[in-house]
Design a protein with these regions (language model features):
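Long, low-complexity, charge-biased intrinsically disordered regions
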Residues: 1-252
Length: 252
């Protein structure tokens, strides 16, 4: 949504990354850990109390979010009523939006000065990497068009899954479904020796993010997850072959 808003109004969209985000969270519960190997302490201690969250702790993500939320609200932002990860601030008729997803932060707004001030405020509290203009976020590439539009695609992800499932050198086809073939469930005692479930899951992730054009094809093959046969695997590979020729397709 924030990408669409930024493009609609012609606002800049910048990206920041919080360095070791989870380590900023202050623990509110009593949590103890074993003394790390190689750490020498005065006294006979069997464990240590965690003051701050650490990676791998089940509370870490929640504590980090509470820490970020508390600080952003302290500098004048309000949490959106529609998205708890979106923060809004209005100053003298100008607004700035901050969206956080774990440790990725997107900032846009009607005033470059207000955006710069917000960045400065955030950097005084958290160590952050400023990537400037957002071009790649959460595995999605943002490609600007000459008319001011933006296309969101997952070319890198497509390359990754093609290689993962041994389809990186396959021949491209123009459609994700072979309409001349009708697939039916099977009651065979054996399944096809192929990573069918993993492949369909990978395609579902792509479908829900930026590739609605493969929704029918993925939904079709997902009907046969319980007992996939060779013809079902061929249908999955057909989708991969379609992706081979449409890597830059996405949401416009």
């Amino acid at each position: 949504m924030i990408i669409a808003i930024a493009k609609y109004f012609g606002w800049p969209l910048d990206q920041l990354d919080v360095v070791t985000a989870f380590l900023y969270g202050i623990m509110k519960e009593l949590v103890f850990c074993a003394v790390p190997e190689g750490v020498d302490l005065d006294g006979d201690f069997d464990c240590l109390e965690l003051v701050k969250a650490i990676y791998g702790l089940k509370q870490a993500s929640r504590v980090w979010n509470e820490t970020f939320d508390e600080f952003v609200c302290s500098i004048g932002f309000q949490v959106s009523a529609f998205d708890p990860c979106l923060y809004i601030k209005v100053v003298d008729g100008h607004c700035v939006l901050v969206l956080v997803y774990v440790d990725d932060v997107l900032i846009t707004g009607s005033s470059p000065e207000l955006i710069a001030r917000t960045k400065t405020d955030l950097k005084t509290r958290f160590e952050m990497t400023d990537s400037g203009k957002c071009a790649f976020v959460l595995g999605i590439e943002l490609v600007d068009g000459p008319d001011g539009s933006v296309t969101m695609c997952q070319r890198r992800y497509v390359d990754d899954i093609l290689k993962r499932f041994g389809m990186d050198e396959c021949k491209a086809v123009v459609s994700p479904v072979d309409m001349s073939t009708r697939l039916v469930p099977s009651d065979a005692a054996t399944k096809v020796n192929a990573p069918f479930r993993e492949a369909v899951g990978a395609l579902m992730h792509l479908m829900t993010a930026t590739r609605p054009d493969i929704a029918y094809a993925v939904g079709y093959v997902s009907r046969f997850m319980e007992n996939p046969q060779e013809e079902h695997w061929v249908a999955v590979k057909r989708i991969f072959r379609y992706l081979q020729g449409t890597k830059t397709h996405g949401i416009y």
